[in-house]
Curated annotation (Swiss-Prot):
ATP binds at R217, D218, E219, Q226, E485, G537, L538, D539, R540. Homodimer. GO terms for biological process: aspartyl-tRNA aminoacylation. One of its GO terms (cellular component) is cytoplasm. The gene is aspS. Keywords: Aminoacyl-tRNA synthetase, ATP-binding, Cytoplasm, Ligase, Nucleotide-binding, Protein biosynthesis. This is Aspartate--tRNA(Asp/Asn) ligase. The lineage of its organism: Bacteria, Pseudomonadati, Pseudomonadota, Gammaproteobacteria, Alteromonadales.
Length: 601
């Protein structure tokens, strides 16, 4: 039906007759002459109808925005003074000779001249996707997946599909369950990841596997979360963690170079403990110059118990953030608002100190400083603080003093807030690897895996691990870019005794382990090779690379924040006959109980 895409017409086609198909993006009637901007996936081109063809002009007069049309015409150079340098096809236009209306369009429920609500955009997603911005993002996504496949396949990776209907496994979020008609009362689960299947593929001798795969998690949603999302899933045999990081870093660097013309350079590596101590996050945004600075040793002897208490507690922490030239940026009201903000993360307050004259302060320890806590500090302590933070005139210092996790999380969140709101971010791209994660964390007396229960410890036997699980480090690694976790992976457990030990540490009984993971434990008996892998969030990667504010803007048909689809009205009620065939009964849940479940979640 067409000989060219609209956005591909250029000066080399001048004098040629061509056929175009697309949508009327804009129509301008200048009396005897009608101008159309015709749009397709590749872009826009200007079409001109002049009075020499009255029948065609008559038909063109009936056109409205979003009519779907076929146009035959002759390419010509635009008249002098009418060239549009801001348009890819701005040097030419098409003289319309024939016009076929393929389909008319009703008035659009979306307004292209204003910002439409998220709900409306998702309800009419097929119209929202016609916008150039959305088309470009989906095109870019396709380029990413193509480049990923090319990179991995050039390194010997095989694209192998794994099941979508599988068994439930404890991976941290709720499963989406699918009732079985042939096995009444039993359920499949949609996979939260292909984790166990890709490990089994390594035990099958596949050695290098990848898959661009859908995953499903029934969890509370945020801007970068969806109930169904796409992973770039990778697993290898006979590779160390260093080698896996090299392979996947190479892929990401090639991706940015090819699609964005950006050289990310070599990714630095940072231990988890350093990331938490310096930045208050296991996915630090290195564009932000602010850091958390420990001052426990300076304040452990002050009379102010808010400081000396945590400073002398092995589980406590006293740390500060020094904000350059921040003293004048915050009134008392502004400081109160920041105090409320850190309170969200458990902080009971946020003392502060303004440096009005650093020379006077370093001389006296008192003069040149402004703070409600100044009376609790000796001259030596104040001077030591200023030297530790390298404070200058005009700076402000924010304090955190509490249990280690509270201080780290609250100051880490404050660091991000200040960096974004005060435009402190430096550079466009700052990648890194975070390594040496703890293997477990203890919550309410129970051990939980930081990553997942199939992650191997670093240089420990099963006996050593069970003797001191809290002190164990995992052979895991996360790739972080601009404060977002792009991907995470680890060396896997390939020894049955080690896997059984991890299950015991996590409180999984032998009976439960056999019921849920018996197939894995058995497979580990038959010469399972050392193996490791990593998974990238494709949606998040494309979101970062395109500058989108949400992963919903880089997915064709995403769900809302309530995991619903306004376009198809999913989820919906099932047909009673279908429920009978499945042996499923729907209980009526009162609203109060639903709210209680949400709060507990």
């Amino acid at each position: 039906m067409r000989s060219l895409y609209c956005g591909e017409v250029n000066e080399s086609h001048i004098g040629q007759e061509i056929t175009l198909c697309g949508w009327v993006n804009k129509r301008r009637d200048l009396g005897a002459v009608i101008f159309l901007d015709l749009r397709d996936r590749e872009g826009l081109v200007q079409v001109v109808y002049d009075p020499d063809l009255p029948e065609v002009i008559k038909k063109a007069n009936t056109l409205r925005n979003e009519f779907c049309v076929q146009i035959k015409g002759k390419v010509r150079a635009r008249p002098e003074g009418q060239v549009n340098k801001g348009m890819k096809t701005g040097g030419i236009e098409v003289l319309g000779l024939e016009l076929t209306i393929l389909n008319k369009s009703a008035p659009l429920p979306l307004d292209s001249n204003q910002v439409n609500s998220e709900e409306l955009r998702l309800k009419y997603r097929y119209l929202d996707l016609r916008r150039v911005e959305m088309t470009e993002r989906l095109r870019f996504r396709a380029k990413v997946t193509s480049a990923v496949r090319s990179s991995l396949e050039s390194q010997g990776f095989l694209d192998i599909e794994t099941p979508i209907l599988t068994a439930a496994t404890p991976e941290g979020a709720r499963d989406y369950l699918v009732p079985s008609r042939t096995h009444k009362g039993q359920f499949f689960a949609l996979p939260q990841s292909p984790q166990l299947f890709k490990q089994l593929l390594m035990m099958s001798g596949m050695e290098r596997y990848y898959q661009i795969v859908k995953c499903f998690r029934d969890e509370d949603l945020r801007a970068d979360r969806q109930p169904e999302f796409t992973q770039i899933d990778i697993e290898t045999s006979f590779m160390s963690s260093d080698q896996v990081m090299e392979v996947t870093e190479k892929m990401i660097r090639e991706l940015f170079q090819e699609l964005l013309d950006v050289d990310l350079g070599e990714f630095p590596r940072m231990p988890y403990s350093e990331a938490m101590t310096r930045f208050g996050s296991d996915k630090p945004d290195l564009r932000n110059p602010l850091e958390l600075i420990d001052v426990d040793d300076i304040l452990k002897d002050v009379e102010f118990k808010v400081f000396s208490g945590p400073a002398n507690d092995e589980n406590g922490r006293v740390a500060v953030i020094c904000l350059p030239q921040g003293a004048a940026k915050f009134s008392r009201k502004g400081l109160d608002e920041l105090t409320k903000f850190v309170g969200i993360y458990g902080a009971k307050g946020m003392p502060w100190l303004k440096v009005n004259d650093i020379d006077a302060a370093l001389s006296t320890g008192v003069e040149g400083l402004q703070s409600p806590i100044l009376k609790f500090l000796s001259s030596d302590e104040a001077i030591a603080l200023l030297k530790r933070t390298n404070a200058k005139t005009g700076d402000i210092i924010f304090f955190g003093a509490d249990q280690y996790n509270v201080v780290t999380e609250s100051l880490g969140a404050l660091r991000l807030k200040l960096g974004e709101e005060l435009d402190l971010l430096q550079g466009e791209w700052k990648p890194l690897w975070v390594v040496d994660f703890p293997m477990f964390e203890e919550v309410d007396g129970h051990m939980h895996a930081i990553h997942h229960p199939f992650t191997a410890p670093t240089n420990l036997t099963a006996e050593q691990l069970e003797a001191n699980p809290v002190g164990a480090l995992s052979d895991a690694y996360d790739m972080v870019l601009n404060g977002c976790e792009l991907g995470g992976g680890s060396v896997r457990i390939h020894n049955q005794d080690m896997q059984a030990a991890v299950f015991r540490i996590l409180g999984i009984s032998d009976e439960e382990a056999e019921e849920k993971f018996g197939f894995l434990l058995e497979a580990l008996q038959y010469g399972a090779p050392p193996h490791a892998g990593l998974a990238f969030g494709l949606d998040r990667l494309v979101m970062l690379m395109t500058g989108a504010s949400s992963i919903r803007d880089v997915m064709a048909f995403p769900k809302t924040n309530t995991a619903a689809c306004p376009l198809t009205n999913a989820p919906g009620k099932a047909n009673p006959e279908q429920l009978r065939e499945l042996g499923v009964a729907v209980l009526e849940v009162k609203k109060a109980e639903e709210n209680k479940d949400e709060e507990q979640a």
